[in-house]
Amino acid sequence: MARELKEVQGIIFKRQKYKEADLLAKIMTKQDGIITLIVKGALRPKSQLSAATLNFSMGTYVIYTSGHGLSNLRTYKEVKQFDGLYRDLTKNAYTSFIFDLIDHAFVEYQPLGKYYDLAVFALKKIDAGVDNEMITQIVQMKMLSAFGVEPELRHCVICGKERGVFDYSIKLGGIVCSDHFAKVNSRLHLTPKQTAVLRTIGLLPIERLGNIELNSETKKATRKAIDRIYRETIDLNLKTKKFLDEIKLF
């Protein structure tokens, strides 16, 4: 494919120094996927491109691309900054992990579709002050399908029962009802409420998810469950997750 100028709408989420005065910046877009951009001269003092490519800048960018490999950022049109993320280390850490997680589920230029909408949802909610932990758990549960390990949350994986008391089994890939608790050694021994939270945030569309308020004990239990699901099914080793976990200790 020949190189062409193209307008893309997206979110800058990662940048690093490239050569003396240039940057490499990653942008997440809905139709064109994740693109690595060369931003020439961005490290020079008066560069307008530097501010437009700060992490978590969302806007319209004009790029020179062939649809594979590195593309070049030529200019930008409208860019929105999320100031709340710059002023708050914790918000920044949660958002960085979310975008890193999505980044690892796709190859470059692979369309993101609904997962881009998920990224925008998380970015806006965290910037607005909605519970960082719950937004992150929502994203983690919904991203399992992107990694090819979507759990069965609608009904018991053994008998198909949709109502009742449930627990979660990583080995079986979803929820199991109380009729089978004695036979399923791999269940996580979550409370009915904790399992219900996983089902709710995993199944409901993001536009129907309001502010989910949970006590710290429930959030801690669901976080441990989700982390274990990821560890035993995907085994990602993300630096952003390690940093986030370290922040939570303080």
From Swiss-Prot:
<dbReference type="InterPro" id="IPR012340">
    <property type="entry name" value="NA-bd_OB-fold"/>
</dbReference>
<comment type="function">
    <text>Involved in DNA repair and RecF pathway recombination.</text>
</comment>
<dbReference type="InterPro" id="IPR022572">
    <property type="entry name" value="DNA_rep/recomb_RecO_N"/>
</dbReference>
<dbReference type="Pfam" id="PF11967">
    <property type="entry name" value="RecO_N"/>
</dbReference>
<keyword id="KW-0233">DNA recombination</keyword>
<dbReference type="Pfam" id="PF02565">
    <property type="entry name" value="RecO_C"/>
</dbReference>
<dbReference type="InterPro" id="IPR037278">
    <property type="entry name" value="ARFGAP/RecO"/>
</dbReference>
<keyword id="KW-0234">DNA repair</keyword>
<keyword id="KW-0227">DNA damage</keyword>
<protein>
    <recommendedName>
        <fullName>DNA repair protein RecO</fullName>
    </recommendedName>
</protein>
<dbReference type="InterPro" id="IPR042242">
    <property type="entry name" value="RecO_C"/>
</dbReference>
<dbReference type="GO" id="GO:0006302">
    <property type="term" value="P:double-strand break repair"/>
</dbReference>
<comment type="similarity">
    <text>Belongs to the RecO family.</text>
</comment>
<dbReference type="InterPro" id="IPR003717">
    <property type="entry name" value="RecO"/>
</dbReference>
<dbReference type="GO" id="GO:0006310">
    <property type="term" value="P:DNA recombination"/>
</dbReference>
<dbReference type="GO" id="GO:0043590">
    <property type="term" value="C:bacterial nucleoid"/>
</dbReference>
